[in-house]
Amino acid sequence: MAQVGRVLFALFCVSFVCIQSLIISGEHADPEAEEAQYVLVLGAHILQDRPSDALIERLKTADTFLDEHPDAIAILCGGQGTNEPMPESHMMRQYMVDTLGTDPDRLLIEDKSRNTIQNIANAKALYPLEESRCAVISSDFHLARARILMEQAGLDPYGVPAPVPNLPLAAASHMREYCSTLGLILTGRYF
């Protein structure tokens, strides 16, 4: 029995190191993002009256990206989760327009999705992403998985990382991303 425990622990350690290496290698910005016509801004949990801190960082990154790329259009992705007062994308738009001063004409909405795979599929169905280069903005820990899922959907994305607001959230998020990535690998939906 102890032998089985050691083998399982070794498998966990190897999978954790491999997946964390993938996550960390994907945390960089692609210089080619300059060419992007569309940028998907992936949603995250919202509170009753505002976006979460992690989502605020994504929105600030999106606002900066739009300032630096005057022809780009942002697609705000995110449906309504449990205990959320509205779809994430609606609050994202509200925050960007009201707080950051983003031009509302440059913000499109995808408000039916519940996860990253649905974010991408729904945005692709609504907007001509296959006809143009697109970027994806998400928290740095989430970027590798988001890019791979976009590639699986037939897109050629550039990654633009948003910082994680604090170290405890970063640690918890890396563990959650490990679990999400492992789940996709084990169900055959990754790679």
Q: Language-model segments: what does each one mean?
A:
Residues A171-Y190:
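A transmembrane-helix-recognition feature enriched in membrane-embedded lipid enzymes
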Residues G5-Q20:
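Hydrophobic membrane-insertion alpha-helices, especially the h-region
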Residues Q20-H174:
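A structural signal for short, hydrophobic/glycine-enriched beta-strand patches
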